[in-house]
A protein has these predicted regions:
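Domain-level signature for soluble enzymes in the chorismate/prephenate branch of the shikimate pathway
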Residues: 1-226
């Protein structure tokens, strides 16, 4: 039986996924299990190391998270139990004493980097980038002695967890960006209807031809399904 007191999320502490987890009422007093990848989060649920997992499914700027969508399509035995929206606000952080003019190398998750590209080109046009597994991991790595990065792009809450200095606030190119997260668990766990339930489906068309997608979508319209 899955441990109902454990929730898996993409860590380490300070990620946007952790902010989504903070919205889950049933997880307020639960143990948090940080993992490195979406697949690890799903595996934690399947192996019953975690009761539920919080993973990103869609970003308003970058679109769907392919790793999550592929996992939902190919993994049997899991279902979605909830969704949570997290506003995406990025800060540029560094170790105390670092100045913005001294920044040459920036580390962050590729998705975060893409959403701050305009600001970076305008304010740090000669910088280079080091990709990280998460924005929080990029920030945490700054505190290591052999860190190659001078600064990191991370969630504004990152300074609540690590001793870092904010060099620039709200550097995202789209100030209204948000990421949608889903809460997944084993499909054999019954739940009551909430009256606000949503159904997600994955469709594979039998052939590739003009109008195929339209014909499929017309089935929803004909039956009054939004």
């Amino acid at each position: 039986m899955a441990n109902k007191s454990t929730y898996a999320y993409l860590g380490p502490v300070g990620t946007f996924t952790e902010l989504a987890l903070a919205q889950v009422k049933d997880a307020k007093n639960a143990s948090k299990l940080p993992v490195s990848t979406i697949q690890e989060a799903i595996d934690a649920v399947l192996s019953k190391k975690a009761f539920r997992a919080i993973i990103p499914v869609e970003n308003s700027i970058e679109g769907g998270v392919s790793a999550t969508l592929d996992a939902l399509a190919n993994t049997k035995g899991i279902r979605i139990f909830g969704e949570y929206l997290v506003p995406v606000t990025f800060n540029l952080v560094a170790k105390p004493g670092m100045k913005l003019s001294d920044v040459k190398v920036i580390s962050t998750h590729p998705t975060a980097y893409a959403q701050c590209r305009g600001w970076l080109q305008e304010n740090l046009p000669k910088h280079s980038q080091i990709p990280a597994t998460s924005t929080a991991q990029a920030a945490l790595a700054l505190l290591e002695k052999d860190s190659y990065a001078d600064a990191a792009i991370a969630a504004k809450s990152i300074t609540d967890h690590y001793k870092l200095t904010v060099l620039a606030k709200n550097i995202g190119d789209n100030k209204n960006a948000q990421t949608r997260f889903i809460e997944i668990g084993l499909a054999d766990v019954p739940t009551k209807r909430s009256g606000k339930d949503k159904t997600s489906i994955i469709v594979e068309l039998p052939d590739d031809r003009p109008g195929g997608l339209l014909e499929m979508l017309e089935q929803f319209a004909a039956r009054g399904v939004n």
